[in-house]
Curated annotation (Swiss-Prot):
Classification via Gene3D superfamilies: 2.60.120.970, Cystine-knot cytokines (2.10.90.10)
Residue ranges of the region described as Disordered: 30-162
Organism: Mus musculus (Mouse)
UniProt KW DNA-binding keyword: no
GO BP terms: BMP signaling pathway; cell surface receptor protein serine/threonine kinase signaling pathway; chondroblast differentiation; chondrocyte differentiation; embryonic limb morphogenesis; forelimb morphogenesis; hindlimb morphogenesis; mesenchymal cell apoptotic process
Coarse class of the protein's main subcellular location: secreted
Protein name: Growth/differentiation factor 5
Length: 495
Protein backbone atom coordinates (compact mmCIF):
# COMPACT_ATOMS: atom_id res chain seq x y z
CA UNK A 1 0.00 0.00 0.00
CA UNK A 2 2.89 2.35 0.66
CA UNK A 3 4.44 1.90 -2.77
CA UNK A 4 1.39 3.14 -4.74
CA UNK A 5 1.08 6.11 -2.40
CA UNK A 6 4.74 7.03 -2.96
CA UNK A 7 4.35 6.81 -6.72
CA UNK A 8 1.25 8.99 -6.56
CA UNK A 9 3.08 11.64 -4.54
CA UNK A 10 6.06 11.56 -6.91
CA UNK A 11 3.86 12.00 -9.99
CA UNK A 12 1.96 14.82 -8.32
CA UNK A 13 5.23 16.55 -7.47
CA UNK A 14 6.54 16.23 -11.04
CA UNK A 15 3.27 17.56 -12.44
CA UNK A 16 3.56 20.57 -10.12
CA UNK A 17 7.08 21.30 -11.31
CA UNK A 18 6.03 21.04 -14.96
CA UNK A 19 3.11 23.39 -14.32
CA UNK A 20 5.41 25.94 -12.69
CA UNK A 21 7.84 25.74 -15.61
CA UNK A 22 5.00 26.23 -18.13
CA UNK A 23 3.79 29.31 -16.24
CA UNK A 24 7.28 30.75 -16.29
CA UNK A 25 7.59 30.16 -19.99
CA UNK A 26 4.19 31.66 -20.71
CA UNK A 27 5.14 34.74 -18.66
CA UNK A 28 7.98 35.67 -21.16
CA UNK A 29 6.19 37.61 -23.98
CA UNK A 30 9.16 37.73 -26.37
CA UNK A 31 9.98 34.05 -26.07
CA UNK A 32 9.51 32.24 -29.33
CA UNK A 33 9.02 35.53 -31.28
CA UNK A 34 12.62 36.41 -32.10
CA UNK A 35 13.43 37.81 -35.45
CA UNK A 36 15.25 35.37 -37.67
CA UNK A 37 18.96 36.18 -37.64
CA UNK A 38 18.86 37.82 -34.19
CA UNK A 39 21.34 36.55 -31.65
CA UNK A 40 20.39 35.31 -28.16
CA UNK A 41 20.53 37.97 -25.49
CA UNK A 42 19.34 40.83 -27.77
CA UNK A 43 15.94 42.48 -27.78
CA UNK A 44 13.70 42.59 -30.84
CA UNK A 45 14.55 46.25 -31.49
CA UNK A 46 18.24 45.53 -31.31
CA UNK A 47 17.89 42.53 -33.59
CA UNK A 48 16.07 44.61 -36.22
CA UNK A 49 18.41 47.63 -36.12
CA UNK A 50 21.61 45.67 -35.97
CA UNK A 51 22.89 45.16 -39.54
CA UNK A 52 24.22 41.73 -40.43
CA UNK A 53 27.96 41.49 -41.05
CA UNK A 54 29.60 39.75 -43.93
CA UNK A 55 31.56 36.69 -43.12
CA UNK A 56 35.34 36.71 -43.05
CA UNK A 57 35.75 40.48 -43.50
CA UNK A 58 39.44 41.42 -43.33
CA UNK A 59 40.20 44.38 -41.09
CA UNK A 60 43.52 46.18 -40.57
CA UNK A 61 45.54 44.53 -37.86
CA UNK A 62 45.18 40.98 -39.13
CA UNK A 63 41.83 40.24 -37.37
CA UNK A 64 38.78 38.62 -39.05
CA UNK A 65 35.39 39.92 -38.08
CA UNK A 66 32.02 38.41 -39.08
CA UNK A 67 29.06 36.34 -38.01
CA UNK A 68 30.38 33.18 -36.48
CA UNK A 69 34.03 34.13 -36.95
CA UNK A 70 34.66 34.49 -33.25
CA UNK A 71 32.31 31.65 -32.29
CA UNK A 72 33.59 29.15 -34.82
CA UNK A 73 36.28 27.97 -32.45
CA UNK A 74 33.68 27.45 -29.66
CA UNK A 75 31.37 25.20 -31.70
CA UNK A 76 31.10 21.58 -30.69
CA UNK A 77 30.63 18.49 -32.80
CA UNK A 78 26.87 19.15 -32.94
CA UNK A 79 27.44 22.61 -34.53
CA UNK A 80 25.56 24.42 -31.74
CA UNK A 81 26.92 27.63 -30.25
CA UNK A 82 26.39 28.80 -26.73
CA UNK A 83 24.50 32.05 -26.39
CA UNK A 84 27.02 33.43 -23.93
CA UNK A 85 29.81 33.32 -26.49
CA UNK A 86 27.70 35.18 -29.04
CA UNK A 87 28.19 38.36 -27.07
CA UNK A 88 30.91 40.64 -28.52
CA UNK A 89 34.23 39.99 -26.87
CA UNK A 90 36.23 42.85 -25.48
CA UNK A 91 39.45 43.08 -27.46
CA UNK A 92 42.57 44.31 -25.71
CA UNK A 93 43.82 47.72 -26.93
CA UNK A 94 46.59 47.68 -29.50
CA UNK A 95 50.03 48.74 -28.51
CA UNK A 96 50.55 52.45 -28.98
CA UNK A 97 46.84 53.17 -29.33
CA UNK A 98 44.49 54.53 -26.65
CA UNK A 99 41.88 52.24 -25.10
CA UNK A 100 38.35 53.01 -26.29
CA UNK A 101 35.68 52.81 -23.62
CA UNK A 102 32.17 51.56 -24.52
CA UNK A 103 29.40 54.11 -24.74
CA UNK A 104 26.28 54.13 -22.56
CA UNK A 105 24.00 52.56 -25.19
CA UNK A 106 24.37 49.03 -26.54
CA UNK A 107 22.98 50.19 -29.90
CA UNK A 108 25.64 52.90 -30.19
CA UNK A 109 28.28 50.41 -29.12
CA UNK A 110 27.27 47.86 -31.78
CA UNK A 111 27.13 50.48 -34.57
CA UNK A 112 30.51 51.92 -33.63
CA UNK A 113 32.08 48.48 -33.53
CA UNK A 114 31.14 47.85 -37.17
CA UNK A 115 31.90 51.20 -38.76
CA UNK A 116 35.17 51.22 -40.74
CA UNK A 117 36.57 54.75 -40.84
CA UNK A 118 39.27 55.42 -43.43
CA UNK A 119 42.50 56.92 -42.20
CA UNK A 120 42.30 60.63 -41.97
CA UNK A 121 38.49 60.74 -41.69
CA UNK A 122 36.24 60.53 -38.62
CA UNK A 123 32.59 59.36 -38.64
CA UNK A 124 30.41 62.28 -39.63
CA UNK A 125 33.49 64.40 -40.28
CA UNK A 126 33.74 65.34 -36.58
CA UNK A 127 36.26 64.45 -33.95
CA UNK A 128 35.13 62.19 -31.13
CA UNK A 129 34.65 63.89 -27.78
CA UNK A 130 34.40 60.71 -25.73
CA UNK A 131 36.73 60.06 -22.88
CA UNK A 132 39.60 57.88 -23.92
CA UNK A 133 39.41 58.88 -27.61
CA UNK A 134 42.54 59.49 -29.67
CA UNK A 135 44.41 62.73 -28.89
CA UNK A 136 44.19 65.65 -31.30
CA UNK A 137 47.82 65.27 -32.39
CA UNK A 138 47.10 61.71 -33.46
CA UNK A 139 44.00 62.80 -35.38
CA UNK A 140 45.94 65.51 -37.18
CA UNK A 141 48.42 62.95 -38.42
CA UNK A 142 45.55 60.98 -39.92
CA UNK A 143 44.17 63.85 -42.00
CA UNK A 144 46.32 62.90 -45.03
CA UNK A 145 44.30 60.69 -47.36
CA UNK A 146 45.70 57.26 -48.21
CA UNK A 147 47.82 57.23 -51.34
CA UNK A 148 48.56 60.96 -51.17
CA UNK A 149 52.33 61.45 -51.65
CA UNK A 150 54.16 63.37 -49.01
CA UNK A 151 55.17 66.88 -49.87
CA UNK A 152 58.77 66.64 -51.12
CA UNK A 153 61.27 68.75 -49.32
CA UNK A 154 62.60 71.49 -51.54
CA UNK A 155 66.20 70.61 -52.38
CA UNK A 156 68.89 73.04 -51.34
CA UNK A 157 69.85 75.32 -54.15
CA UNK A 158 72.88 77.55 -53.95
CA UNK A 159 72.31 81.24 -54.61
CA UNK A 160 72.56 82.19 -58.29
CA UNK A 161 75.94 83.39 -59.51
CA UNK A 162 75.91 86.89 -60.97
CA UNK A 163 78.52 87.22 -63.73
CA UNK A 164 80.88 90.15 -63.53
CA UNK A 165 80.10 92.88 -66.02
CA UNK A 166 83.69 92.79 -67.24
CA UNK A 167 83.34 89.11 -68.20
CA UNK A 168 80.18 89.88 -70.17
CA UNK A 169 81.99 92.69 -71.98
CA UNK A 170 84.95 90.41 -72.60
CA UNK A 171 82.70 87.75 -74.10
CA UNK A 172 81.03 90.24 -76.43
CA UNK A 173 84.41 91.52 -77.54
CA UNK A 174 86.21 88.23 -78.11
CA UNK A 175 83.26 86.38 -79.61
CA UNK A 176 82.92 89.03 -82.30
CA UNK A 177 84.52 87.86 -85.51
CA UNK A 178 85.95 91.27 -86.29
CA UNK A 179 87.27 91.84 -82.76
CA UNK A 180 86.25 95.48 -82.85
CA UNK A 181 86.41 97.64 -79.75
CA UNK A 182 86.76 96.26 -76.24
CA UNK A 183 89.66 96.29 -73.86
CA UNK A 184 93.11 96.36 -75.38
CA UNK A 185 94.77 95.30 -72.12
CA UNK A 186 93.83 91.68 -72.71
CA UNK A 187 94.28 91.58 -76.49
CA UNK A 188 97.71 89.94 -76.28
CA UNK A 189 96.70 87.31 -73.75
CA UNK A 190 93.33 86.71 -75.38
CA UNK A 191 94.93 86.26 -78.78
CA UNK A 192 96.97 83.33 -77.44
CA UNK A 193 94.64 82.05 -74.75
CA UNK A 194 91.47 80.08 -75.26
CA UNK A 195 90.41 80.15 -71.60
CA UNK A 196 89.95 83.10 -69.23
CA UNK A 197 88.94 82.28 -65.66
CA UNK A 198 87.70 85.00 -63.31
CA UNK A 199 87.78 85.09 -59.51
CA UNK A 200 85.80 87.54 -57.37
CA UNK A 201 87.42 89.26 -54.39
CA UNK A 202 86.38 87.80 -51.02
CA UNK A 203 88.19 90.33 -48.82
CA UNK A 204 86.53 92.82 -46.47
CA UNK A 205 87.55 96.29 -45.31
CA UNK A 206 88.40 96.85 -41.68
CA UNK A 207 85.89 98.90 -39.72
CA UNK A 208 87.47 102.13 -38.64
CA UNK A 209 87.77 105.83 -39.36
CA UNK A 210 90.34 105.19 -42.10
CA UNK A 211 91.49 102.30 -44.30
CA UNK A 212 95.27 102.32 -44.71
CA UNK A 213 95.59 98.83 -46.19
CA UNK A 214 93.31 96.59 -48.18
CA UNK A 215 93.67 92.84 -48.61
CA UNK A 216 92.24 91.20 -51.72
CA UNK A 217 91.69 87.46 -51.30
CA UNK A 218 90.90 85.01 -54.11
CA UNK A 219 90.12 81.30 -53.94
CA UNK A 220 92.10 79.65 -56.76
CA UNK A 221 91.92 76.04 -55.54
CA UNK A 222 89.89 74.90 -58.57
CA UNK A 223 92.12 76.58 -61.17
CA UNK A 224 93.64 74.43 -63.91
CA UNK A 225 97.39 74.88 -63.46
CA UNK A 226 98.49 73.71 -66.93
CA UNK A 227 98.98 76.01 -69.89
CA UNK A 228 98.75 79.32 -68.00
CA UNK A 229 99.90 82.39 -69.93
CA UNK A 230 99.12 85.46 -67.81
CA UNK A 231 97.33 86.95 -64.81
CA UNK A 232 96.05 90.39 -63.92
CA UNK A 233 94.21 92.15 -61.10
CA UNK A 234 91.47 94.68 -61.79
CA UNK A 235 90.32 97.06 -59.03
CA UNK A 236 87.57 99.63 -59.52
CA UNK A 237 88.13 103.20 -58.38
CA UNK A 238 84.76 104.73 -57.60
CA UNK A 239 84.13 108.36 -56.71
CA UNK A 240 83.33 108.56 -52.98
CA UNK A 241 79.71 109.21 -52.08
CA UNK A 242 80.82 111.30 -49.11
CA UNK A 243 81.76 114.69 -50.51
CA UNK A 244 83.74 115.39 -47.34
CA UNK A 245 86.27 112.77 -48.43
CA UNK A 246 88.40 114.17 -51.26
CA UNK A 247 89.15 112.03 -54.29
CA UNK A 248 92.74 113.38 -54.40
CA UNK A 249 95.22 114.02 -51.61
CA UNK A 250 94.60 117.19 -49.64
CA UNK A 251 98.03 118.58 -50.40
CA UNK A 252 97.36 118.52 -54.13
CA UNK A 253 100.20 116.10 -54.76
CA UNK A 254 99.66 112.75 -56.44
CA UNK A 255 99.63 109.74 -54.14
CA UNK A 256 101.51 106.54 -54.87
CA UNK A 257 99.76 103.16 -54.99
CA UNK A 258 101.71 100.10 -53.89
CA UNK A 259 100.56 96.55 -54.60
CA UNK A 260 102.36 93.67 -52.90
CA UNK A 261 101.76 90.10 -51.80
CA UNK A 262 100.52 89.43 -48.29
CA UNK A 263 103.24 88.42 -45.84
CA UNK A 264 102.76 84.95 -44.39
CA UNK A 265 104.98 83.24 -41.84
CA UNK A 266 108.57 83.45 -42.98
CA UNK A 267 107.56 84.69 -46.43
CA UNK A 268 107.93 88.49 -46.55
CA UNK A 269 105.75 90.71 -48.71
CA UNK A 270 106.89 91.04 -52.33
CA UNK A 271 106.38 94.37 -54.09
CA UNK A 272 104.50 93.91 -57.36
CA UNK A 273 103.67 97.35 -58.71
CA UNK A 274 104.00 101.04 -57.86
CA UNK A 275 102.04 103.71 -59.69
CA UNK A 276 100.74 107.24 -59.29
CA UNK A 277 97.08 107.92 -58.61
CA UNK A 278 95.70 110.74 -60.78
CA UNK A 279 92.65 112.79 -59.98
CA UNK A 280 89.36 110.90 -60.02
CA UNK A 281 86.67 112.53 -62.13
CA UNK A 282 84.59 109.33 -62.44
CA UNK A 283 84.82 105.59 -62.06
CA UNK A 284 87.69 103.65 -63.63
CA UNK A 285 89.59 100.40 -63.35
CA UNK A 286 93.16 100.05 -62.12
CA UNK A 287 94.76 97.06 -63.88
CA UNK A 288 97.87 95.37 -62.44
CA UNK A 289 99.93 92.74 -64.24
CA UNK A 290 100.85 90.16 -61.57
CA UNK A 291 101.94 87.26 -63.77
CA UNK A 292 105.52 87.28 -62.44
CA UNK A 293 104.28 86.77 -58.90
CA UNK A 294 101.49 84.39 -59.78
CA UNK A 295 103.85 81.97 -61.54
CA UNK A 296 105.31 81.21 -58.12
CA UNK A 297 101.94 81.02 -56.33
CA UNK A 298 99.82 79.23 -58.94
CA UNK A 299 99.93 75.96 -57.00
CA UNK A 300 98.51 77.63 -53.89
CA UNK A 301 94.87 77.31 -52.89
CA UNK A 302 94.52 81.02 -52.14
CA UNK A 303 95.97 84.23 -53.49
CA UNK A 304 96.29 87.27 -51.21
CA UNK A 305 97.30 90.74 -52.39
CA UNK A 306 97.72 93.91 -50.35
CA UNK A 307 97.10 97.48 -51.52
CA UNK A 308 98.15 100.73 -49.84
CA UNK A 309 98.63 104.40 -50.80
CA UNK A 310 101.39 106.78 -49.66
CA UNK A 311 101.95 110.52 -49.80
CA UNK A 312 105.21 112.04 -48.58
CA UNK A 313 105.96 108.97 -46.54
CA UNK A 314 102.56 108.87 -44.88
CA UNK A 315 99.77 106.36 -45.47
CA UNK A 316 96.66 107.76 -47.14
CA UNK A 317 93.06 106.66 -46.55
CA UNK A 318 92.18 104.42 -49.49
CA UNK A 319 88.50 105.27 -49.23
CA UNK A 320 89.29 108.87 -50.08
CA UNK A 321 90.96 107.64 -53.28
CA UNK A 322 87.88 105.73 -54.43
CA UNK A 323 88.83 102.24 -53.19
CA UNK A 324 86.11 101.81 -50.59
CA UNK A 325 84.58 98.31 -50.85
CA UNK A 326 81.59 98.68 -48.54
CA UNK A 327 78.21 97.80 -50.13
CA UNK A 328 79.68 97.21 -53.56
CA UNK A 329 77.78 95.13 -56.10
CA UNK A 330 79.29 92.06 -57.74
CA UNK A 331 80.19 93.91 -60.92
CA UNK A 332 82.05 96.51 -58.83
CA UNK A 333 84.23 94.11 -56.85
CA UNK A 334 87.88 93.47 -57.61
CA UNK A 335 88.48 90.82 -60.25
CA UNK A 336 91.41 88.47 -60.72
CA UNK A 337 91.82 87.06 -64.24
CA UNK A 338 93.93 84.10 -65.32
CA UNK A 339 94.65 83.47 -69.01
CA UNK A 340 95.50 80.00 -70.27
CA UNK A 341 95.60 77.77 -73.29
CA UNK A 342 95.35 74.02 -73.07
CA UNK A 343 97.59 72.03 -75.40
CA UNK A 344 94.98 69.35 -76.05
CA UNK A 345 91.51 70.03 -77.35
CA UNK A 346 89.04 70.40 -74.52
CA UNK A 347 85.80 68.52 -74.93
CA UNK A 348 82.60 70.25 -73.89
CA UNK A 349 81.60 66.85 -72.53
CA UNK A 350 84.30 67.20 -69.84
CA UNK A 351 82.61 70.27 -68.36
CA UNK A 352 79.26 68.49 -68.34
CA UNK A 353 80.95 65.54 -66.65
CA UNK A 354 82.48 67.78 -63.98
CA UNK A 355 79.07 69.23 -63.13
CA UNK A 356 77.14 65.95 -63.05
CA UNK A 357 79.42 63.20 -61.76
CA UNK A 358 82.55 61.18 -62.21
CA UNK A 359 81.49 58.40 -64.55
CA UNK A 360 79.85 58.39 -67.95
CA UNK A 361 76.73 56.67 -66.63
CA UNK A 362 76.07 59.55 -64.24
CA UNK A 363 76.58 62.04 -67.07
CA UNK A 364 74.00 60.35 -69.27
CA UNK A 365 71.53 60.23 -66.38
CA UNK A 366 72.08 63.97 -65.89
CA UNK A 367 71.54 64.67 -69.58
CA UNK A 368 68.36 62.62 -69.82
CA UNK A 369 66.95 64.13 -66.62
CA UNK A 370 67.44 67.60 -68.07
CA UNK A 371 65.84 66.43 -71.30
CA UNK A 372 62.75 65.16 -69.48
CA UNK A 373 62.32 68.52 -67.75
CA UNK A 374 62.28 70.35 -71.08
CA UNK A 375 60.40 67.74 -73.10
CA UNK A 376 57.00 69.46 -72.87
CA UNK A 377 58.23 72.95 -73.94
CA UNK A 378 60.14 71.39 -76.82
CA UNK A 379 57.11 69.44 -78.03
CA UNK A 380 54.89 72.51 -77.91
CA UNK A 381 57.39 74.70 -79.70
CA UNK A 382 58.73 72.41 -82.38
CA UNK A 383 55.60 70.54 -83.38
CA UNK A 384 55.94 67.76 -85.91
CA UNK A 385 59.35 67.12 -87.40
CA UNK A 386 59.40 67.21 -91.20
CA UNK A 387 60.01 63.89 -92.86
CA UNK A 388 63.50 63.20 -94.17
CA UNK A 389 64.23 63.03 -97.85
CA UNK A 390 66.12 59.74 -98.08
CA UNK A 391 67.14 60.38 -101.69
CA UNK A 392 68.87 63.71 -100.98
CA UNK A 393 72.62 63.82 -101.43
CA UNK A 394 75.03 64.59 -98.61
CA UNK A 395 74.83 68.23 -97.58
CA UNK A 396 74.79 70.52 -94.55
CA UNK A 397 71.45 70.81 -92.79
CA UNK A 398 70.20 73.12 -90.05
CA UNK A 399 70.63 72.18 -86.39
CA UNK A 400 69.57 74.79 -83.85
CA UNK A 401 70.98 74.23 -80.36
CA UNK A 402 69.12 75.87 -77.46
CA UNK A 403 70.85 75.44 -74.09
CA UNK A 404 67.81 76.78 -72.27
CA UNK A 405 65.58 74.07 -73.72
CA UNK A 406 68.19 71.54 -72.63
CA UNK A 407 68.02 72.82 -69.05
CA UNK A 408 71.55 74.20 -69.02
CA UNK A 409 70.71 77.88 -68.67
CA UNK A 410 71.52 77.66 -64.95
CA UNK A 411 75.25 77.43 -65.72
CA UNK A 412 75.68 78.57 -69.33
CA UNK A 413 75.55 82.36 -69.46
CA UNK A 414 76.13 82.96 -73.17
CA UNK A 415 75.26 82.04 -75.81
CA UNK A 416 71.94 80.50 -74.86
CA UNK A 417 71.49 79.27 -78.43
CA UNK A 418 73.46 78.93 -81.65
CA UNK A 419 73.41 77.24 -85.06
CA UNK A 420 75.50 74.07 -85.02
CA UNK A 421 74.34 72.50 -88.33
CA UNK A 422 74.72 68.81 -89.13
CA UNK A 423 75.44 66.58 -92.13
CA UNK A 424 72.80 64.40 -93.72
CA UNK A 425 72.23 62.64 -97.02
CA UNK A 426 73.38 59.83 -99.29
CA UNK A 427 76.88 59.23 -100.60
CA UNK A 428 76.24 57.65 -104.00
CA UNK A 429 78.52 57.00 -106.92
CA UNK A 430 79.77 59.14 -108.54
CA UNK A 431 80.81 61.38 -105.64
CA UNK A 432 80.70 65.11 -106.28
CA UNK A 433 83.87 67.14 -105.93
CA UNK A 434 82.39 69.56 -103.40
CA UNK A 435 81.99 66.63 -100.99
CA UNK A 436 85.80 66.42 -100.85
CA UNK A 437 85.94 62.62 -100.78
CA UNK A 438 89.10 60.80 -99.84
CA UNK A 439 90.57 58.13 -102.07
CA UNK A 440 89.32 55.50 -99.67
CA UNK A 441 85.81 56.98 -99.83
CA UNK A 442 85.88 56.84 -103.63
CA UNK A 443 86.89 53.17 -103.67
CA UNK A 444 84.34 52.25 -100.98
CA UNK A 445 81.54 54.05 -102.85
CA UNK A 446 82.49 52.27 -106.08
CA UNK A 447 82.46 48.87 -104.37
CA UNK A 448 79.09 49.65 -102.80
CA UNK A 449 77.58 50.55 -106.17
CA UNK A 450 78.76 47.21 -107.60
CA UNK A 451 77.73 45.01 -104.65
CA UNK A 452 75.70 46.82 -101.96
CA UNK A 453 75.41 43.70 -99.81
CA UNK A 454 79.17 43.21 -99.44
CA UNK A 455 80.27 46.82 -98.89
CA UNK A 456 78.43 49.51 -96.90
CA UNK A 457 78.14 53.02 -98.33
CA UNK A 458 80.29 55.88 -97.15
CA UNK A 459 78.91 58.23 -94.51
CA UNK A 460 77.99 61.88 -94.73
CA UNK A 461 80.10 63.55 -92.03
CA UNK A 462 81.50 67.02 -91.22
CA UNK A 463 84.76 67.76 -93.00
CA UNK A 464 85.40 71.21 -91.55
CA UNK A 465 84.29 72.63 -88.20
CA UNK A 466 84.74 75.96 -86.44
CA UNK A 467 84.87 76.95 -82.75
CA UNK A 468 82.52 79.03 -80.65
CA UNK A 469 83.10 80.92 -77.40
CA UNK A 470 81.05 80.03 -74.33
CA UNK A 471 80.72 82.00 -71.11
CA UNK A 472 79.71 79.68 -68.30
CA UNK A 473 79.90 78.98 -64.57
CA UNK A 474 82.22 76.10 -63.77
CA UNK A 475 81.77 73.52 -61.01
CA UNK A 476 83.60 75.82 -58.54
CA UNK A 477 81.16 78.71 -59.24
CA UNK A 478 83.76 80.73 -61.14
CA UNK A 479 82.78 82.52 -64.35
CA UNK A 480 84.88 81.19 -67.24
CA UNK A 481 85.25 82.30 -70.83
CA UNK A 482 86.34 79.41 -73.04
CA UNK A 483 86.69 78.75 -76.73
CA UNK A 484 85.61 75.25 -77.72
CA UNK A 485 86.82 73.80 -80.99
CA UNK A 486 84.69 71.85 -83.49
CA UNK A 487 81.31 73.19 -82.40
CA UNK A 488 79.89 74.38 -85.76
CA UNK A 489 79.77 72.40 -89.01
CA UNK A 490 81.14 74.44 -91.90
CA UNK A 491 81.13 71.79 -94.65
CA UNK A 492 80.13 68.16 -95.18
CA UNK A 493 81.63 65.32 -97.17
CA UNK A 494 81.61 61.58 -97.70
CA UNK A 495 84.07 59.52 -95.69
Amino acid sequence: MRLPKLLTLLLWHLAWLDLELICTVLGAPDLGQRTPGAKPGLTKAEAKERPPLARNVFRPGGHIYGVGATNARAKGSSGQTQAKKDEPRKMPPRSGGPETKPGPSSQTRQAAARTVTPKGQLPGGKASSKAGSAPSSFLLKKTREPGTPREPKEPFRPPPITPHEYMLSLYRTLSDADRKGGNSSVKLEAGLANTITSFIDKGQDDRGPAVRKQRYVFDISALEKDGLLGAELRILRKKPLDVAKPAVPSSGRVAQLKLSSCPSGRQPAALLDVRSVPGLDGSGWEVFDIWKLFRNFKNSAQLCLELEAWERGRAVDLRGLGFERTARQVHEKALFLVFGRTKKRDLFFNEIKARSGQDDKTVYEYLFSQRRKRRAPLANRQGKRPSKNLKARCSRKALHVNFKDMGWDDWIIAPLEYEAFHCEGLCEFPLRSHLEPTNHAVIQTLMNSMDPESTPPTCCVPTRLSPISILFIDSANNVVYKQYEDMVVESCGCR
